[in-house]
């Protein structure tokens, strides 16, 4: 227990290598400590040691099969490794254990979208939002899926909901700009891209999108500056 606490303390101050050592010492004393395997997995994930993170989450789940957050994190790590079908199974397991797990529904939606299963992704995002209506990321992700389905007006509403919850959400401003651009509302799209850049000045995609919109409006000098 002491080594687990010291590991958490090291993690809090950003000493991740020391964190790993403390958790491993805890597991040497008590190998069936599911929470420490989970904590070790989170640390490996932060260190981008994804294969090690997967092993730690799997060990946690072997000890505690109903560990919903470990299922969710395992899914997220598998997704990062490109193992999308396995990630889907992990998220579904997390949801089976904890049906009101909004993050797991959202993450499942992200993975289904990557697999090209847009209708299923929409349903997952909608379930996340039914549980957590003020979930800005969920509204943004639902907007992206609807955008890809060509449902632009519905996508606009989703991005606007995300921004009503989190006005500093640069990605949602950019995505709203894209939807408005496709609806040929170029002046409004420009404002969205500009807001995204104000929030996140190094947002390359927003600069590029702003340049394209300004070019379409015939503002060539301003367009060139955006591309620069």
Model segments located where?
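Short, intrinsically disordered, charge-balanced linker/junction segments flanking boundaries
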Residues: 219, 223-228
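Conserved alpha-helical positions within TPR/SEL1-like repeat arrays
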Residues: 1-12, 35-46, 69-80, 103-114, ...
């Amino acid at each position: 227990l002491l080594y687990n606490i010291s590991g958490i303390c090291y993690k809090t101050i950003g000493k991740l290598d020391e964190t790993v050592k403390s958790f491993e010492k805890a597991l040497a004393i008590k190998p069936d400590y599911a929470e420490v395997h989970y904590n070790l997995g989170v640390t490996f994930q932060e260190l981008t040691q994804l294969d090690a993170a997967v092993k730690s989450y799997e060990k946690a789940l072997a000890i505690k099969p109903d560990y919903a957050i470990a299922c969710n994190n395992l899914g997220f790590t598998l997704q990062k490794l490109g193992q999308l079908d396995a990630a889907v199974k992990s998220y579904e397991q997390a949801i089976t254990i904890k049906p009101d797990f909004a993050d797991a529904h959202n993450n499942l939606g992200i993975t289904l979208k990557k697999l090209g299963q847009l209708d299923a992704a929409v349903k997952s995002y909608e379930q996340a939002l039914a549980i957590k209506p003020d979930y800005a990321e969920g509204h943004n992700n639902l907007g992206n899926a609807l955008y890809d389905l060509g449902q632009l007006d519905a996508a606009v509403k989703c991005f606007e909901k995300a921004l009503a919850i989190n006005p500093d959400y640069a990605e949602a401003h950019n995505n709203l700009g894209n939807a408005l651009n496709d609806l040929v509302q170029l002046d409004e799209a420009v404002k969205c891209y500009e807001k995204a850049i104000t929030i996140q000045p190094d947002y390359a995609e927003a600069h590029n999108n702003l340049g394209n919109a300004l070019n379409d409006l015939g503002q060539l000098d301003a367009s060139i500056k955006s591309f620069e």
